[in-house]
Amino acid sequence: MSVSFGAEVVDGGTRFAVRSATPVTLCLFDDAAERQIPMTGADGVWHAEIEGVSVSARYGYRAAADPAKLLVDPYAIQLDRPFHYDPCLGEPGIDTTALVPRAIVTPPPNAPVAPPLFTPGGLIYELNVRGFTMLHPDVPEAQRGTIAALAHPAVIAHLKKLNVAAIELMPIVAWIDERHLPPLGLTNSWGYNPVVPMAIDPRLAPGGVAELVETVAALRSAGIGVILDLVFNHTGESDRLGPTLSLRGFDDPLYYAHAPDGSLVNDTGTGNTLDCSRPEVRALILGSLRHFARCGVDGFRFDLATILARGPGFDPHAPIFAEIAADPLLASRVMIAEPWDIGPGGYQLGQFPDHWLEWNDRYRDDVRRFWRGDGSAGELATRIAGSADLFGPGDTRTVNFLAAHDGFTLADLVSYAERHNHANGEDNRDGHGDNLSWNNGVEGPSDDPAIRQRRGDDLRALLATLFASRGTIMLTAGDEFGRTQQGNNNAYAQDNAIGWVEWQNRDRDLEAFVAALAAFRAANRLDAVAPYADADWRALDGEVMTPDRWHDAPGFELRLADGDAQIALRIDRQTRRVSLSRRTIVESR
């Protein structure tokens, strides 16, 4: 018999179920009072049905392994407060009742599960909810930093101007700060340190999951889909010194991968790794995906997605892929992999199932190299044409991007040769050291008109290349108008002006340029994922491009037939120019 985990409202009360290796006590909270009720269990699953308990009741659990630790239901839908790190959370035997959020009994969402609006080839717009809206002048101050702000007419108008097909929300489920951040006076603002996989962080949705449902509906009515970035590779319980908040307290050996010596596997760089080879872990992941599908979202981006398919190594036929494909709620959703982790054999670009899209860092790096001046035109052409060397000769599954939340913003890419992460408190050691960036002669801000012109030309060349590329493309919020993080390429802990999108002084000329690119791409069907039917590659002098010319060529021209017209893409590194044009084909008689 299948088990309905979490808190399920039934006639006259609520039914609770949780998985645990040791006996569990249900804790019901009424203001400061706590009522403890032993649960009954079999085969590691513990149950209780309590009369008179209904929607809005607050609860938690205590497991016999350490009853001092209040634990959050892994299947919780709503929490009464955010997580805040405290050293006591990781100390065995110390009571954490005052430190841990309570779950709130909440009915599941039931939005219509319509087909996704997003189709491959469209523009994905990656954003951080807080960072995107905290400084938005048109959003009411009380609404800034929340999911509801994304439904504001001014936000939707901006997205429509760019022809955004779907926004991709960086993690929204409840997370906790890494333990080194509070002593530095910093907080994690990106959310890639989740505790439970379904409950939205109360800072982003004070009214709970209903706010996500309403925002998704508003965006869908404007023709914009929503993709959620979900983290199923680790949790914020971290390493052996980390906090005990949920899974660790219930059954550490079940949920987390361990080496033969009993130590935690760390293929994520965060201290622990979820063991997705276990059916119980996959059931939790699938439960989260179904929950958010019922909120109306188009699909999901999987952080460090190689973890999903790890045995000891990566298995392209791992059970979770078939389970997602067979699920009636999930089979039609958009699935996007970040196709790597830091474990052995973790880099798996091109190896995910045929219906999954994949972040293509080869595209990012080859385009950057070309415009920096040390890459080949041949590699650039391969990336623009859909990366058939990675995804095969058919429809491409690439997600092309130049910048993402990790790394430099696009404006910083052409303004800084080195990272400047001192504000993160790690002596500038964190973040990637090799960014394939360049500063155009001066590190950081410059008032020199010539340098500013070169940087502007580089930005336009990069952006035009992106919008001319075959396959799905992704733009990170603010890159369309020159957002800077002051050279910080790892702004995960900058919940301040460094990490927030600055709207007032944005480069409106660049923004208009990107809007024009988006319009040209849509009008001329450059968003195709199918292979080019009739591609004519030319050197800049008009001659046919030959294999021996690709490596040292300063650019090329690609001509694509489109009915009675021809689309021409001309890339010239010497002049820092990308030209896109449509012209009528004149037949000679």
Predicted region positions:
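Conserved alpha/beta catalytic core and glycan-binding cleft of carbohydrate-active enzymes
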Residues: 76, 89-93, 99, 104, ...
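Substrate-binding/active-site clefts of carbohydrate-active enzymes
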Residues: 128-297, 305-326
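Core domains of carbohydrate- and sulfate-ester-processing enzymes
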Residues: 59, 63-111, 179-185, 193, ...
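Short proline/glycine-enriched turn/loop motifs at strand-loop junctions of beta-rich domains
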Residues: 19-24
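Conserved, mostly hydrophobic/aromatic
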Residues: 18, 61, 127, 169, ...
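The feature marks proteins involved in alpha-glucan
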Residues: 1-11, 40-45, 49-126, 133-142
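Structural beta-strand segments of beta-rich domains
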Residues: 12-16
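Glycan-recognition and catalytic regions of carbohydrate-active enzymes
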Residues: 3, 452, 459-487, 500, ...
